[in-house]
């Protein structure tokens, strides 16, 4: 379930999946057991949704299977709490470029502005890395002490990427 992105990558995923001739392309993410749609403009409306092969070989969308058999797929307690939403998205990611600085919504913001019951809390388990343009990969997390909302807003609006990176730990 490779998902299109504006950046390139995926050679490590190709290698992990035993693909011949691993290469970086615009599908640097593998969404695992996904019931989430990518929503990238101009892409297929079902991109990101995982498909499950049934014993007879028919492929069905996991989200459709869960909606048809919610308690059998997720359990009664899960359905009572979250309905047919998984509430999690697992991605395998291999980027061949520095990813953009990202800010993820809280659940409250997502509900009010994005029509979603979920924010985007993330956890990362790094299995392998590779240099990108000669730079050893690294992850920035959170703001340095003293960075104000007004300062960061100004930097983002100016699209000053080095300054954005400079505000992060």
Enumerate the language-model features and the residues they cover.
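Transition-metal
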Residues: 1-147
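Active-site glycine-rich loop that binds ribose-phosphate moieties when present
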Residues: 148-169
